[in-house]
UniProtKB/Swiss-Prot annotation:
The gene is ACTC1. Actins are highly conserved proteins that are involved in various types of cell motility and are ubiquitously expressed in all eukaryotic cells. Its EC number is 3.6.4.-. It is linked to Cardiomyopathy, dilated, 1R: A disorder characterized by ventricular dilation and impaired systolic function, resulting in congestive heart failure and arrhythmia. Patients are at risk of premature death. Cardiomyopathy, familial hypertrophic, 11: A hereditary heart disorder characterized by ventricular hypertrophy, which is usually asymmetric and often involves the interventricular septum. The symptoms include dyspnea, syncope, collapse, palpitations, and chest pain. They can be readily provoked by exercise. The disorder has inter- and intrafamilial variability ranging from benign to malignant forms with high risk of cardiac failure and sudden cardiac death. There is a cross-link at residue 272 (Isoglutamyl lysine isopeptide (Glu-Lys) (interchain with K-52)). In vertebrates 3 main groups of actin isoforms, alpha, beta and gamma have been identified. The alpha actins are found in muscle tissues and are a major constituent of the contractile apparatus. The beta and gamma actins coexist in most cell types as components of the cytoskeleton and as mediators of internal cell motility. The modification Tele-methylhistidine is found at residue 75. This is Actin, alpha cardiac muscle 1. It comes from Homo sapiens (Human). The modification N6-methyllysine is found at residue 86. One of its GO terms (molecular function) is hydrolase activity. InterPro entries: Actin, Actin/actin-like_CS, Actin_CS, ATPase_NBD.
Length: 377
């Protein structure tokens, strides 16, 4: 930690599902909370209780029974700017308790995002929060930093978007980036659907959060899907029980691995797309023939949706099947990969060589929001 917390840079990783925020130089984010804004569904009757017209993050999560929950970031793209401002305000003033006008701020975004998205981010940071300087970094690149590499292919899968980003000697190769709008939130929705087939009905935005918890606690990736299905059909060894908030206990069996299997077979949710193993392979094949070997040997996983037990072994198996037989394939799954984007941001923002990369308030005033495309790439 820097001695003077007065001028330390802030790092804010705005995920579709979780906001990770903290100070550059720390080894973990100080604040991790859901990217949710909740609004009451009912009329307040108790006068003087100080009810608010909206709740953010954990508070929205704890009062979810009476709220309608909305995620302002969908598939990595900010779709509701008013709610996003609320989330940033909450991050700075309630979670980190800092004055944003005193700290340079590093934000993150998904690769291949619309240009307007980062322009608007830049504009809000400078005009609403008056930050002295800011920067927008690509999430997958930060994950590679966090793993201590400069070359590799990152599979970054969060709540809203999954992407493969090949990076060679610190340069992302934009022509080979693959983006797949299938991630944690879609898996939660799919789990809601297949639990309905078992007779458990989850419909509201609050119940979706329960299903997300079931997914995080009980789901895993099968090494061989067909075999696992056969095992599940013939015995109850794979069944697990889960206690709902009201004390009712439900049992789930093959749903545990059918849910994340969607990552490898997107047709499960009606998506016409290759699975994550194929997009990884396709991305490597779009790179120059001389660097493929280095990419195969450095497959870095990052993001919350890569946290399923068994996912690294399955990726190893699938990519080995696609790649040339002599190729050495290595999947790197760091235990802290849930936060590796944030950790990479923390490393980047505290490098002395990075200090001239910030977009200053002065540069913004001279050039306007489009400065972000020139300074951040």
């Amino acid at each position: 930690m820097c001695d003077d917390e007065e001028t330390t840079a802030l790092v804010c990783d705005n995920g579709s599902g979780l906001v990770k925020a903290g100070f550059a130089g720390d080894d973990a984010p100080r604040a991790v909370f859901p990217s949710i804004v909740g609004r009451p569904r009912h009329q307040g009757v108790m006068v003087g209780m100080g009810q608010k017209d909206s709740y953010v993050g954990d508070e929205a999560q704890s009062k979810r029974g009476i709220l309608t929950l909305k995620y302002p970031i969908e598939h990595g793209i900010i779709t509701n700017w008013d709610d996003m401002e609320k989330i940033w305000h909450h991050t700075f003033y309630n979670e980190l308790r800092v004055a944003p006008e005193e700290h340079p701020t590093l934000l993150t975004e998904a690769p291949l995002n619309p240009k307007a998205n980062r322009e608007k981010m830049t504009q809000i940071m400078f005009e609403t929060f008056n930050v002295p300087a800011m920067y927008v970094a690509i999430q997958a690149v930060l994950s590679l930093y966090a793993s201590g590499r400069t070359t590799g292919i990152v599979l970054d899968s969060g709540d809203g978007v999954t992407h493969n980003v090949p990076i060679y000697e610190g340069y992302a190769l934009p022509h080979a980036i693959m983006r797949l709008d299938l991630a944690g939130r879609d898996l939660t929705d799919y789990l809601m659907k297949i639990l309905t087939e078992r007779g458990y009905s989850f419909v509201t935005t609050a119940e979706r959060e329960i299903v997300r918890d079931i997914k995080e606690k009980l789901c895993y990736v099968a090494l061989d899907f067909e075999n696992e299905m056969a095992t599940a059909a013939s015995s109850s060894s794979l069944e697990k029980s889960y206690e709902l908030p009201d004390g009712q206990v439900i049992t789930i069996g093959n749903e545990r691995f059918r849910c994340p299997e969607t990552l490898f077979q997107p047709s499960f949710i009606g998506m016409e797309s290759a699975g994550i193993h194929e997009t990884t392979y396709n991305s490597i094949m779009k790179c120059d023939i001389d660097i493929r070997k280095d990419l195969y040997a450095n497959n870095v996983l990052s993001g919350g949706t890569t946290m399923y037990p068994g996912i690294a072994d399955r990726m190893q198996k699938e990519i080995t099947a696609l790649a040339p037989s002599t190729m050495k394939i290595k999947i790197i799954a760091p235990p802290e990969r849930k936060y590796s984007v944030w950790i990479g941001g923390s490393i980047l923002a505290s490098l002395s060589t990075f200090q001239q990369m910030w977009i200053s308030k002065q540069e913004y005033d001279e050039a306007g929001p489009s400065i972000v495309h020139r300074k951040c790439f």
